[in-house]
Amino acid sequence: MSNDTPFNALWQRMLARGWTPVSECRLDDWLTQAPDGVVLLSSDPKRTPEVSDNPVMIGELLREFPDYTWQVAIADLEQSEAIGDRFGVFRFPATLMFTGGNYRGVLNGIHPWAELINLMRGLVEPQQERAS
């Protein structure tokens, strides 16, 4: 990957956060180690500039749900397409959500903060209720 591409700059920022690169063929293995996990799927920031905002938004969003031991995986452009195909995702950026090792759903695109909180709550609250 060339160091001068917008995606490479984004990739380096995500790696600096300690997030784990994952491929489609290694995703299931990663999920056994990270039952409360999110997988960030990207597209070319030149075509979809909001891809660069997604890691910031998701990082903040996860702090709003501290009952989970969140771990974050990131997929490069090629693997984002492969993983997206597996989960029926065709709009990027996308964030796959897993709790207790189970797929809960996907957050597609960028949303206003209050809407994003509500979307996330809809994905994780049923799990919280079962834990009570």
Predicted regions and their residues:
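A short, hydrophobic/aromatic-rich structural module that often spans a beta strand
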Residues: 6-17, 22, 83-103
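Thiol-based oxidoreductase modules, predominantly thioredoxin-like and allied folds used
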Residues: 21, 41-43, 59-81
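Short amphipathic alpha-helical segment that frequently serves as the phosphate-/nucleotide-binding helix
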Residues: 52-58
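Non-catalytic, surface beta->alpha helical segment in thiol-disulfide oxidoreductase systems
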Residues: 91-132
